[in-house]
Amino acid sequence: MKSTTKDLVFIALSTTIMIVCAFITVPFYVPFTMQTFALFTIIGLLGTKKAFISICLYLLLGAVGLPVFSGFKGGIGSLLGVTGGYLIGFLFTVIVSGTLLHIFSKRKKCTVVSYCVAMVLGLIVCYAFGTLWFLLLYTNSTGSISVTSVLSLCVFPFILPDMVKIGLSWYVVKLLKKHIMRL
């Protein structure tokens, strides 16, 4: 397969995987989904540029109204709502984690530890952006809320599940990367 055709296929498949993982949901104020697992796996398999395009496509599909977000939601309101910052934060996760993975792989130091460090740092950026977004929008629409309350609602419950997803994504990337490179 030609490189550009192969890239387009992988980007489309990754976007589809992101959509499917958004539908695997445990309802909560900020829903528990498998999106972050898909995000970490996409970054690990595709690298920064292609992963960024895939996540942009995912967000664009949702923004135009297709029900690709958790709870079968879509529309610009999903992105601009109080929890939309976490979705937009996925783009920052791609940039941070993908760049770090690239640096580690150039130095031949892309181990499970460096993979996890790259993903955790990207996730922290996503948490920070999403939390700040939530705090600003919630405060403007409803009234004052403390940072601790937002963290308790939107971040703390997700830390352990996200760490498990990072470990699981490393395993999946390790299994699939060698096969994808052969295509």
What kind of feature is each model-predicted range?
Residues 1-4, 29-30, 71-72, 76, ...:
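Helix-boundary and loop/linker segments of multi-pass membrane transporters
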Residues 8-13, 37, 41, 52-57, ...:
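Hydrophobic alpha-helical transmembrane segments
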Residues 22-32, 59-93:
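Interfacial aromatic-anchored transmembrane helix boundaries in multi-pass membrane proteins
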Residues 1-54, 64:
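Hydrophobic transmembrane alpha-helices
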Residues 17, 21, 25, 42, ...:
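Alpha-helical membrane-inserting segments
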Residues 13, 56-60, 84, 92, ...:
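Hydrophobic residues within alpha-helical transmembrane segments
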Residues 109-183:
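Membrane-embedded alpha-helical hairpins and interfacial helices in multi-pass inner-membrane proteins
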Residues 13, 20, 76-128:
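Short helix-perturbing small/polar motifs within transmembrane alpha-helices
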